[in-house]
Amino acid sequence: MDGIKYAVFTDKSIRLLGKNQYTFNVESGSTRTEIKHWVELFFGVKVKAMNSHRLPGKGRRMGPILGHTMHYRRMIITLQPGYSIPPLRKKRT
C-alpha cells in the first residue's frame, strides 16, 4: 500500500479500538480520499469517518549541524458498525 505506512499502537489508539476506530501513520502527501480508498480496498471494510492531524518532526543534531526528521500524518479511521480489521483487534487477556 502506497499511502499507509503502518498501524499505531499507543494508549489512545488501543482505547479507540473499542469504539471501532483504527489509527495509522500515512504518507504526508496522501489525501483523505486516497487513504479511504486504500483502507476499503485492502481490508474490505466500509469507512464511516476519518480524522487526521500532522505530527511535527523531531530535531536532530550531529555536532554543530542542526537537522530534523520528517513530519508525518496520522489518520484515525472510524469504520461502520459490523466491520472490523481482524489483525489489529486488541486481544483480551
Swiss-Prot record:
GO terms for biological process: translation. It comes from Eucalyptus globulus subsp. globulus (Tasmanian blue gum). The gene is rpl23-A. It holds the Pfam family Ribosomal_L23. The keyword Mitochondrion does not apply. The lineage of its organism: Eukaryota, Viridiplantae, Streptophyta, Embryophyta, Tracheophyta. This is Large ribosomal subunit protein uL23cz/uL23cy. It is found in: Plastid, Chloroplast. It comes from the Eukaryota. Part of the 50S ribosomal subunit. One of its GO terms (molecular function) is mRNA binding.
